[in-house]
Amino acid sequence: MCIRDRDNVLWKPPGGKTLGFHQDAAYDDWLIPQTMMTCWMSLDDTSKETGTLEYIKGSHKWGLQPPKGEFHSPEDYKKELNIFAEKNNKQIQVTYVEVPAGGVSFHHGFTWHGSGINTSSNNRRAIVSHCVPSNAKFHPTNQGGTAKTYKKYKKENSDLLDEEYFPLLWESNSI
Protein backbone atom coordinates (compact mmCIF):
# COMPACT_ATOMS: atom_id res chain seq x y z
CA MET A 1 0.00 0.00 0.00
CA CYS A 2 1.12 3.53 -0.74
CA ILE A 3 0.30 6.98 0.67
CA ARG A 4 1.05 10.26 -1.10
CA ASP A 5 3.29 12.32 1.15
CA ARG A 6 3.47 15.44 -1.05
CA ASP A 7 3.67 16.71 -4.62
CA ASN A 8 5.94 19.29 -6.21
CA VAL A 9 5.78 21.16 -9.49
CA LEU A 10 9.25 21.87 -10.86
CA TRP A 11 10.13 24.39 -13.55
CA LYS A 12 13.64 24.95 -14.84
CA PRO A 13 13.51 27.64 -17.56
CA PRO A 14 16.35 28.22 -20.03
CA GLY A 15 19.32 29.28 -17.90
CA GLY A 16 17.68 27.72 -14.82
CA LYS A 17 20.12 26.94 -12.04
CA THR A 18 21.30 23.73 -10.41
CA LEU A 19 19.70 21.53 -7.78
CA GLY A 20 22.25 20.11 -5.37
CA PHE A 21 22.62 16.37 -4.96
CA HIS A 22 20.55 15.06 -2.06
CA GLN A 23 18.41 12.14 -0.87
CA ASP A 24 14.66 12.81 -0.65
CA ALA A 25 14.09 10.61 2.42
CA ALA A 26 16.66 12.60 4.42
CA TYR A 27 14.12 15.42 4.67
CA ASP A 28 11.38 13.17 6.06
CA ASP A 29 12.76 12.64 9.56
CA TRP A 30 9.26 13.45 10.82
CA LEU A 31 8.12 10.03 9.52
CA ILE A 32 8.52 6.43 10.68
CA PRO A 33 9.71 4.54 8.68
CA GLN A 34 11.89 7.17 7.06
CA THR A 35 11.67 5.79 3.53
CA MET A 36 9.85 6.75 0.35
CA MET A 37 9.58 6.33 -3.39
CA THR A 38 9.58 9.31 -5.73
CA CYS A 39 7.74 9.47 -9.06
CA TRP A 40 9.19 12.15 -11.39
CA MET A 41 6.82 12.90 -14.32
CA SER A 42 8.30 14.97 -17.13
CA LEU A 43 6.13 17.55 -18.87
CA ASP A 44 8.81 18.35 -21.46
CA ASP A 45 11.39 16.36 -23.37
CA THR A 46 14.45 16.14 -21.13
CA SER A 47 18.16 15.93 -21.86
CA LYS A 48 21.46 16.70 -20.21
CA GLU A 49 21.24 20.16 -21.82
CA THR A 50 17.85 20.93 -20.18
CA GLY A 51 19.34 20.23 -16.76
CA THR A 52 17.53 16.93 -16.39
CA LEU A 53 17.46 14.78 -13.29
CA GLU A 54 20.73 12.96 -12.59
CA TYR A 55 20.90 9.74 -10.56
CA ILE A 56 23.95 8.15 -8.99
CA LYS A 57 23.87 4.48 -9.91
CA GLY A 58 23.54 2.18 -6.88
CA SER A 59 23.44 5.04 -4.37
CA HIS A 60 20.14 3.81 -2.91
CA LYS A 61 22.26 1.08 -1.25
CA TRP A 62 24.61 3.57 0.45
CA GLY A 63 22.30 4.24 3.39
CA LEU A 64 20.50 7.37 4.44
CA GLN A 65 22.61 10.41 5.27
CA PRO A 66 21.54 13.42 7.37
CA PRO A 67 20.05 16.29 5.34
CA LYS A 68 22.58 18.88 4.21
CA GLY A 69 20.38 21.96 4.42
CA GLU A 70 19.55 24.10 1.40
CA PHE A 71 20.13 22.45 -1.95
CA HIS A 72 18.56 24.99 -4.33
CA SER A 73 21.01 26.67 -6.74
CA PRO A 74 24.34 25.82 -5.11
CA GLU A 75 27.45 26.91 -6.98
CA ASP A 76 28.82 23.35 -6.89
CA TYR A 77 25.77 21.11 -7.10
CA LYS A 78 27.82 17.93 -6.64
CA LYS A 79 29.74 19.15 -3.57
CA GLU A 80 27.83 17.16 -0.89
CA LEU A 81 27.83 14.04 -3.07
CA ASN A 82 31.58 14.30 -3.68
CA ILE A 83 32.31 14.82 0.02
CA PHE A 84 30.23 11.77 0.95
CA ALA A 85 31.67 9.58 -1.82
CA GLU A 86 35.28 10.46 -0.97
CA LYS A 87 34.77 9.97 2.77
CA ASN A 88 33.06 6.59 2.23
CA ASN A 89 35.10 5.33 -0.74
CA LYS A 90 32.11 5.26 -3.11
CA GLN A 91 32.32 5.37 -6.90
CA ILE A 92 30.16 7.99 -8.62
CA GLN A 93 28.46 6.92 -11.84
CA VAL A 94 25.96 9.49 -13.14
CA THR A 95 22.86 8.45 -15.09
CA TYR A 96 20.99 11.25 -16.89
CA VAL A 97 17.21 10.79 -16.91
CA GLU A 98 16.43 11.58 -20.55
CA VAL A 99 12.76 10.96 -21.25
CA PRO A 100 10.16 12.42 -23.63
CA ALA A 101 7.32 14.62 -22.41
CA GLY A 102 4.98 12.33 -20.49
CA GLY A 103 7.84 10.04 -19.49
CA VAL A 104 8.17 8.90 -15.90
CA SER A 105 11.09 7.95 -13.69
CA PHE A 106 10.92 6.38 -10.22
CA HIS A 107 13.61 6.44 -7.57
CA HIS A 108 14.11 5.21 -4.02
CA GLY A 109 14.19 7.86 -1.29
CA PHE A 110 17.85 7.03 -0.53
CA THR A 111 18.97 7.63 -4.16
CA TRP A 112 21.41 10.52 -4.51
CA HIS A 113 20.13 12.84 -7.24
CA GLY A 114 20.35 16.44 -8.44
CA SER A 115 20.42 18.42 -11.67
CA GLY A 116 22.66 20.79 -13.58
CA ILE A 117 22.01 24.12 -15.29
CA ASN A 118 19.51 24.27 -18.15
CA THR A 119 21.80 25.34 -21.00
CA SER A 120 19.11 24.82 -23.66
CA SER A 121 16.47 27.22 -24.99
CA ASN A 122 13.69 24.93 -23.70
CA ASN A 123 11.82 24.66 -20.42
CA ARG A 124 12.24 21.59 -18.25
CA ARG A 125 9.10 21.04 -16.20
CA ALA A 126 8.04 18.09 -14.09
CA ILE A 127 5.48 17.01 -11.52
CA VAL A 128 6.88 15.02 -8.62
CA SER A 129 4.97 12.78 -6.20
CA HIS A 130 6.63 11.46 -3.06
CA CYS A 131 5.01 8.29 -1.74
CA VAL A 132 5.49 6.56 1.61
CA PRO A 133 4.43 3.14 2.92
CA SER A 134 0.87 2.88 4.19
CA ASN A 135 2.15 2.08 7.69
CA ALA A 136 4.04 5.40 7.87
CA LYS A 137 3.24 7.57 10.85
CA PHE A 138 4.46 10.74 12.50
CA HIS A 139 7.69 10.42 14.46
CA PRO A 140 6.77 11.01 18.13
CA THR A 141 9.72 13.29 18.96
CA ASN A 142 11.40 14.73 15.83
CA GLN A 143 10.48 18.40 15.52
CA GLY A 144 13.20 19.89 13.29
CA GLY A 145 13.69 20.22 9.55
CA THR A 146 10.55 19.73 7.48
CA ALA A 147 8.67 18.49 10.58
CA LYS A 148 7.83 22.15 11.23
CA THR A 149 5.77 22.12 8.04
CA TYR A 150 4.20 18.67 8.19
CA LYS A 151 3.48 18.32 11.93
CA LYS A 152 0.66 20.86 11.51
CA TYR A 153 -1.29 18.06 9.78
CA LYS A 154 -0.93 15.74 12.78
CA LYS A 155 -4.14 14.90 14.61
CA GLU A 156 -4.13 15.32 18.35
CA ASN A 157 -3.55 12.02 20.19
CA SER A 158 -2.67 10.11 16.99
CA ASP A 159 0.56 9.46 15.10
CA LEU A 160 -1.30 8.13 12.03
CA LEU A 161 -1.19 10.10 8.78
CA ASP A 162 -4.59 11.67 8.17
CA GLU A 163 -5.93 10.54 4.78
CA GLU A 164 -7.48 13.98 4.31
CA TYR A 165 -3.93 15.35 3.85
CA PHE A 166 -2.01 12.17 2.97
CA PRO A 167 -4.30 10.17 0.63
CA LEU A 168 -4.01 6.44 0.10
CA LEU A 169 -2.98 6.00 -3.55
CA TRP A 170 -2.92 2.25 -3.81
CA GLU A 171 -3.59 -0.87 -1.79
CA SER A 172 -3.14 -4.48 -2.85
CA ASN A 173 -6.86 -5.31 -2.86
CA SER A 174 -7.85 -2.25 -4.91
CA ILE A 175 -7.36 -3.87 -8.32
Go through the PLM ranges and name each one:
Residues 24-29, 92-94:
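Short, P/G- and charge-enriched loop/turn segments at secondary-structure junctions
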Residues 14-27:
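Short acidic (Asp/Glu) patches
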Residues 68-70, 104-106, 110-175:
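Non-heme Fe(II)/2-oxoglutarate
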Residues 8, 23-25, 41-45, 57:
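Short, structured patches in soluble enzyme cores that scaffold and shape functional sites
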Residues 29-48, 98-99, 106, 130-134:
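Short, conserved beta-strand element in jelly-roll/cupin
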Residues 6-15:
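Short, glycine/charge-rich beta-strand/loop segments that flank catalytic centers
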Residues 46-112:
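Double-stranded beta-helix
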Residues 1-3:
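Short, small-residue-biased leader/transition segments that mark boundaries at the very start
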